[in-house]
């Protein structure tokens, strides 16, 4: 380890001890060192012994900084790894940190643009509008049009900080995986790999810009969701420029009600937006926490969601969507056998899994949930319980479904915060049934045929040549087969002839031996000579 890594490790250990997180460590030889450090570093005391363990964990991650805050946020979605009281606290982590110097932000923007900021913008506000662990946001106006915009800039020198902490995380995960057998099923190294990929992706604002443009295209002209326009010609890897929007934060219930917002419709539209993204577009905003969602105040009776920060998105293929739709429909029809069989057929649990045992395990977990009124059932928790049960049957983690489950929990939470009587099933069921109807039956066949029509239209002029070539090749193949068959028949005839001559020759040789013992020498000689002749003829027939 380098001196800087040792220093950072000491800082992490100090924070861990100050918040009493050594209580989280299992009783194992590897974990005795941190526990002994509690005695060795006697001057470091547990500052909050009266606080619950989950709260102490959250506060410790906040103190350790952006890498650990985001790691805690990601881990809050992995309820298969953490008990509820810890996962609930991790979900409260807020990605809000002190802003860095505005002049430094301006210098970083000018470095990305390749010239003074005044060449492109006016009214630049050096005081940030918002600040997070990875980036900071300032306001300005476009010089040519006077249009209000926001500039999102990556924090300078954030990458080395992230890479250093990630290296330490890898070291810790490798040690845990190597020395604690019961932790191996949690795959700590894979968890860190997944986290590193997510975090590094957020450092490239071109990716976020691309995601925002895609989501904006998908909802162009929609009354349900608005995504701010990205000004692409002045955006780059470390700078993203987009239009400025004015809205009410979705968690500000008091202001929404004061504005006369139709809360029921707003809540239902949140669910509708989510399922539209999933089943129509196969592309969904996967970070829809309250800080990234606003409400357009202009038409409160017909409220529109506004989605920001598209750094994290999820994509689903046809199989993923079928899995989600059929499982949810199976649940609400209490067809747990179908749910179990779907997992086996998809290959997500081993083919040798006992379907009856799997069905029974799902039924035990889900029956209490579906005993509630439909309006009280949480889709997100249904999926969570399903994933946890399936993992006991060796289901591999599906990252895209974990993202989807996290987003669904966000959407449900927001929806019921806005309108507690929200019936998600009533809103979601039409999406599921419509999508399934499009996948099965005559309509699905005609749709598939229509989709393939341009391809076949392009290939149609080649069809006569293809038919001619196929017929010609078929004729040549038939001729070859006839020759092969004729050769085969000739070979079989030769084999039969050779076998006959061999048998006759063997019989004559045996007769010659008998005649010789009876002193009939002349006849024995003739029989032997004839037998040898037949053998020679059989050998020739076999050639």
Curated annotation (Swiss-Prot):
CDD domains xrefs: UbiB (cd13972)
SUPFAM superfamilies tied to this protein: Protein kinase-like (PK-like)
InterPro entries hit by this protein: ABC1_dom, Kinase-like_dom_sf, UbiB, UbiB_bact, UbiB_kinase
Binding residues for ATP: 129-137, 152
Listed transmembrane segments: 517-539
Main localization (coarse): membrane
E.C. code: 2.7.-.-
Keywords: ATP-binding, Cell inner membrane, Cell membrane, Kinase, Membrane, Nucleotide-binding, Transferase, Transmembrane, Transmembrane helix, Ubiquinone biosynthesis
Assigned protein family: Belongs to the ABC1 family. UbiB subfamily.
Name used for this protein in its record: Probable protein kinase UbiB
Gene name in the database record: ubiB
């Amino acid at each position: 380890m380098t001196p800087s890594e040792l220093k950072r490790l000491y800082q992490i250990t100090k924070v861990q001890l100050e918040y009493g997180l050594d209580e989280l460590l299992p009783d194992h030889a590897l974990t005795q060192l941190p526990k002994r450090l509690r005695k060795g570093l006697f001057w470091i005391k547990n500052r909050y012994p009266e606080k619950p363990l989950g709260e102490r964990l959250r506060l410790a991650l906040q103190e350790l900084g952006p890498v650990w805050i985001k790691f805690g946020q990601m881990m809050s979605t992995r309820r298969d790894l953490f008990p509820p009281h810890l996962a609930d606290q991790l979900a409260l982590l807020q990605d809000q940190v002190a802003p860095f110097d505005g002049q430094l932000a301006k210098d970083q923007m000018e470095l990305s643009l390749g010239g003074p900021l005044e060449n492109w913008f006016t009214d630049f506000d050096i005081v940030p509008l918002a600040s997070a662990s990875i980036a900071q946001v300032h306001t300005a106006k476009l010089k040519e049009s006077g249009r209000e915009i926001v500039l999102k800039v990556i924090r300078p020198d954030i990458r080395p900080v992230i890479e250093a902490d990630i290296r330490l995380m890898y070291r810790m995960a490798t040690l845990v995986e190597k020395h604690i057998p019961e932790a191996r099923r949690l795959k700590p190294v894979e968890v860190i790999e997944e986290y590193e990929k997510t975090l590094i992706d957020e450092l490239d604002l071109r990716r976020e810009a691309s995601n925002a443009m895609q989501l904006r295209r998908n909802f162009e002209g929609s009354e349900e969701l608005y995504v701010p326009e990205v000004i692409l010609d002045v955006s780059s890897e470390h700078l993203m420029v987009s239009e400025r929007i004015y809205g009410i934060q979705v968690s500000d219930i008091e202001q929404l009600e004061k504005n006369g917002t139709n809360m029921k419709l707003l809540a239902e539209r949140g669910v509708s937006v989510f399922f539209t993204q999933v089943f129509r577009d196969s592309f969904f905003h996967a970070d829809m926490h309250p800080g990234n969602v606003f409400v357009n105040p202009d038409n409160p009776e017909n409220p529109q969601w506004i989605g920001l920060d598209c750094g994290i998105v999820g994509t689903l293929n046809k199989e993923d969507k079928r899995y989600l739709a059929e499982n949810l429909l199976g649940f609400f029809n209490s067809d747990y056998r179908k749910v179990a069989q779907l997992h086996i057929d998809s290959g997500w649990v081993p083919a040798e899994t006992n379907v009856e045992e799997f069905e029974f395990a799902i039924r035990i977990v889900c029956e209490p949930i579906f005993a509630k009124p439909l309006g009280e059932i949480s889709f997100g928790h249904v999926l969570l319980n399903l994933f946890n049960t399936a993992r006991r049957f060796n289901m591999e983690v599906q990252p895209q479904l974990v993202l989807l489950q996290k987003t669904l929990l966000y959407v449900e939470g927001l929806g019921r915060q806005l309108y507690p009587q929200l019936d998600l099933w009533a809103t979601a069921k039409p999406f599921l049934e419509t999508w399934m109807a499009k996948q099965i039956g005559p309509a699905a066949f005609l749709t598939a045929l229509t989709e393939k029509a341009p391809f076949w239209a392009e290939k149609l002029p080649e069809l006569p040549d293809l038919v001619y070539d196929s017929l010609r090749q078929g004729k040549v193949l038939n001729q070859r087969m006839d020759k092969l068959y004729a050769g085969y028949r000739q070979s079989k005839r030769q084999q039969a002839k050779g076998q006959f001559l061999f048998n006759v020759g063997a019989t004559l040789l045996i007769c010659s031996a008998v005649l010789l013992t009876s002193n009939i020498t002349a006849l024995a000689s003739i029989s032997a000579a004839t037998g040898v002749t037949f053998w020679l003829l059989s050998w020739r027939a076999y050639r």
